[in-house]
């Protein structure tokens, strides 16, 4: 009985540590680096996909820790055939993609998200990390969802990336290809190790209990 108690106590400590580690991972979010704040244009040159919302121009998207990112195609209003790439691979095209199409990226360490937009081509015209803050050239706008699902928050775990292909005439309405991004936590290796330790301990206790019943 004393041995089982000690094992259960160790399992409890392992599970507690796992939960604590997972909590710290879940606190990781995507943030913006650089750029300036403002609102997408209104009027005839307004955004036809997300409307006029507050957000960031010329900013880069940075992951604070290990994350899984899901990108969702929301739509476009553009004459050119624009593209969205993840890890250098074509994922969305305004010629073929449909609302709700998804793509994923796994981020294993803090750093820039690895996506790019192509202006009337399937190769990058603007890459996250080199997003200019001037209009008239390919660039993108970022806005975050708040807890109620409204765009315009300063930061968060979900938002939109809206592309301006810099086409002529330059309208800076950022609806030439729009995607939503949603991030979720990825447990670090130490977390998985703790969880496996806990499961192994539970299995050992169950095995010892069955052995005693068989002997009895």
Language-model-detected regions and their locations in the chain:
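Extracellular distal adhesion/interaction modules in secreted or cell-surface proteins
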Residues: 28-157
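Extracytosolic secretory-pathway proteins
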Residues: 154-166
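C-terminal membrane-anchoring or membrane-association module
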Residues: 204-216
